[in-house]
Amino acid sequence: MKIIGDNLVPFKAFSKVTGIEDIKNTKPNSMIFFDFNEELLKYSFFQHLNFLVYVKSIKEAIYASNFNAKYIICENELAKKLQKIADNYMWDSKILTIIKSSDDLEKVALEEIDGAIYSDLLEIKVWKIF
């Protein structure tokens, strides 16, 4: 299970972007994060970028997977549904559910979700991911 944002687990820096200009201003080979956006998905795919994308629906997740998102981030109820779909279709993208503390890790593991990301990471400009 992947854990992103825990103090005990190292993780590589990533940046939140809202547009293509933001992406162009990131360091080469850096990981980027954005809310689902068709333009950013296409750009990231064709530029062969590593990215995380926040989705709100199964449809958005299907598109994110097809554009090779490294991680698809969503709320827990959606994550449970997406994990079954991802497993069935053998997506390369990993499903991450949003958690508030390490107390939530056992629940995520029992639900067999690929991983978890701490909510506080999604509220600031620069984060770390491994």
For each predicted feature, which ranges?
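Solvent-exposed alpha-helices and their adjacent loops that cap or buttress functional pockets
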Residues: 25, 88-89, 109-110
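Long alpha-helical, hydrophobic tracts
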Residues: 57-59, 69-71, 88
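Glycine-enriched alpha-helix->loop->beta-strand junction motifs that scaffold or abut catalytic
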Residues: 47-51, 67-72, 92, 110-117
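Glycan-processing catalytic domains of CAZymes
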Residues: 8-9, 108-130
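Glycine-rich beta-to-alpha transition loops that act as phosphate-gripper elements at the mouths
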Residues: 35, 52-58, 76, 95-104, ...
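Active-site-adjacent beta->alpha loops and helix N-cap segments on the catalytic face
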Residues: 31-46, 73-91, 103, 123-130
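Catalytic cores of alpha/beta
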Residues: 58-67, 100-115
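Conserved N-terminal beta1-alpha1 strand-loop-helix module at the mouth
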Residues: 1-66
